[in-house]
Design a protein with these regions (language model features):
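Extracellular and select intracellular beta-sandwich modules with Ser/Thr-enriched
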Residues: 15-22
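Short acidic/polar inter-strand loop motif in beta-rich domains
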Residues: 4-12
Length: 340
């Protein structure tokens, strides 16, 4: 980081006030020591797949179609099954260009994605091999559990959500989507978690300190920042999308004792990240802040892409195409989470 600051006081700012800065990322090549394989055990039940390792255990449900439990250090870390998410709350700018009407199928896809043919052999929408859902593959260093979801769109679409569980408690997560002709671009591509509201502090290595978006990040600095989850809710007259963070290498959401979840992404392909007291749907449903529901969860969204917020005008201009996820080709997003 290069920073230019005032050498002396002026009528408009004190000595030391920053007037300009520039940043560049320098890649450091390091040899990565080979990691030892931490032992784990896999249990296949009638309706569940369990994995137990060093200080953790996880449970995947055949009946409910997802990761239903992640215990770390004796504490349950998730409150609901993580879900593929393709929707962000509309902004005032979006209302002018009818984003909800044009892209509304992705809201339904987020709310009502259903695991395909739970516990049965099923064909893919795209043809090809018969799939068991979920699939479970035990490898030398990890267990790979993959779910295939039907998305409530027309024409029909599907996505897969893969969990690779390592013996030390890390879960590498990959969301994959193959394009379907005739569908509008999605506002967001990521995974939504609900954890207990006691996890109320977020720290991240990425752009900050203020919120940033795909088309609102050039004035931000790459660094390590921290704030309260509640402070990421902008005080708009009408609740709408807010609090996003771009270029995130890692982020952790913790309670007052420092316990929580750590999310990491490849530095070469950092993620978008959000930690708020509400889901996009709860924010969208409230026309005034007092209509927001009581806070029960911290809602985490780890995202490969999120549509920008636009703003050329607020009465019809769309977000620029380069800031909208491209769904004309396969889309994949990989990140890792673990308890801390």
């Amino acid at each position: 980081t290069i920073s230019f600051r005032l050498k002396e006081d002026t009528s408009w700012a004190k000595k030391g006030h920053e007037v300009a800065f520039g940043q560049g990322v320098i890649a450091v090549v390091r040899s990565i020591p080979s990691k030892k394989v931490t032992p784990f055990t896999v249990t296949h039940g009638t309706h569940n797949i369990g994995v137990r390792g060093e200080n953790f255990d996880v449970l995947f449900s055949d009946l409910n179609g997802g990761l239903t439990s992640y215990h770390y250090a004796g504490k349950e870390m998730i409150q609901e099954i993580p879900r593929p998410n393709f929707w962000r709350a509309p902004t005032d700018n979006d209302c002018g260009n009818n984003m909800g009407g044009v892209r509304g199928q992705w809201k339904l896809a987020s709310l009502y994605a259903t695991a395909k043919g739970i516990g049965k052999e099923i064909p893919s929408v795209h043809g090809g091999t018969i799939l068991q859902n979920p699939t479970c593959e035990v490898e030398a260093d990890s267990v790979v559990v993959t779910y295939l979801y039907n998305l409530q769109t027309s024409p029909a679409a599907e996505c897969s959500l893969q969990y690779r569980v390592f013996g030390d408690g890390r879960i590498q997560t990959t969301l994959h989507y193959d394009p379907v002709e005739g569908l509008a671009a999605m506002p967001e591509f990521g995974v939504l978690f609900k954890i207990d509201a006691d996890y109320d502090t977020v720290e991240w290595y990425g752009n900050g300190p203020a919120e940033t978006y795909w088309d609102r990040q050039h004035g931000a600095k790459l660094g390590i920042y921290q704030n309260k989850v509640a402070d990421n809710m902008a005080q708009y007259l009408v609740p709408q999308e807010c609090g996003a963070k771009t270029a995130v290498r890692w982020a952790k959401v913790v309670d007052r004792k420092g316990r929580g979840l750590l999310f990491t992404a490849d530095a070469a392909k950092p993620m978008f990240f959000s930690a708020l007291p509400y889901t996009p749907h709860e924010m969208e449903s409230a026309k005034h802040p007092y209509e927001l529901p009581p806070v029960h969860y911290t809602v985490i969204r780890a995202m490969g892409e999120q549509m920008g917020v636009g703003g050329d005008d607020s009465w019809g201009a769309n977000v620029h195409p380069e800031y909208i996820p491209d769904v004309t080709k396969p889309v994949e997003f990989t990140f890792t989470f673990r308890g801390i």
